[in-house]
Each structure stands twice: as C-alpha cells, then as structure tokens.
C-alpha cells in the first residue's frame, strides 16, 4: 500500500479524538476497503498513558468482528503522540506483528503521518478523497 485515503472530515475527527484524550495517547481502528477508510472506530487506551497505548482484547475482537460483518477490514491503527508523528521503538515492535498502516497524529504539531512496516518502516502518503459536488 502506497497511500491511505481519508476524507477531510475523517482527518478532523481523528485530530479531535486525539485532542479529547489529552494528556494521554488516543487510539482507534480505521476500517475500510483496500486503502480507503470507511469507518473510524475509537478505542479506549487502557494504559491511560501519555506515552503508550493498549487496547482491551475484547474490544479488539469486537473491531475485527464488526469489520467482517460490514464487509470491511481493519486497514489501519491510529494513535496519537505527544511529540513528533513518527513511530516510537514500542510502535516498531507492534508494527512487525500488526501489518497494517499505522497512522500517527502529533498533538503538539497538529500533524498526521502514516507508516507501514515491511522489513523496515516506510512513510506512506495520506490521500484526501473528498467528493466534490
């Protein structure tokens, strides 16, 4: 995957989720088809930490079941960082076992970036797909 596709409204929603959970990291699953995000599923950070996040296993199972029931996939994991929007050493470990796009939002820089892991971390583009009418 070379890009992940989000609407402006989805980007704003993710930024709002990140800001609403300050000072802690926020997290969400992005459900969709191929590279296009169709649904944002906010998750609770059970770590309640400004530097890490974890999701309750039952909530993870619910997200995967919901995606399957709607004909979608979990295409990305979103979370916020208090600093730069780049993967931490902890993120890198989890990216290896969760081979989806990782979208990171910096609450200090109001900047969002997306990454994939395939033997190494690679930044990918975020494509805005607003429909003009």
Model-derived segments and their meaning:
Residues 1-74, 82-133:
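Conserved beta-strand-loop surface patch within small alpha/beta domains used
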């Amino acid at each position: 995957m070379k890009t992940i596709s989000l609407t402006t409204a989805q980007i704003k929603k993710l930024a709002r989720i990140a800001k609403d959970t300050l000072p802690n990291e926020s997290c969400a699953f992005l459900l969709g088809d191929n590279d296009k995000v169709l649904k944002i599923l906010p998750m609770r950070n059970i770590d309640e930490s400004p530097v890490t996040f974890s999701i309750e296993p039952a909530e993870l199972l619910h997200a995967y079941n919901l995606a399957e029931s709607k004909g979608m996939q979990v295409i990305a994991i979103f979370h916020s960082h208090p600093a730069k929007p780049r993967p931490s050493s902890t993120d890198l470990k989890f990216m290896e076992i969760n081979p989806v796009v990782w979208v990171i939002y910096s609450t200090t820089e109001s900047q969002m970036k997306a990454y994939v892991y395939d033997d190494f971390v690679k930044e990918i583009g975020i494509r805005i797909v607003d429909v003009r009418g």
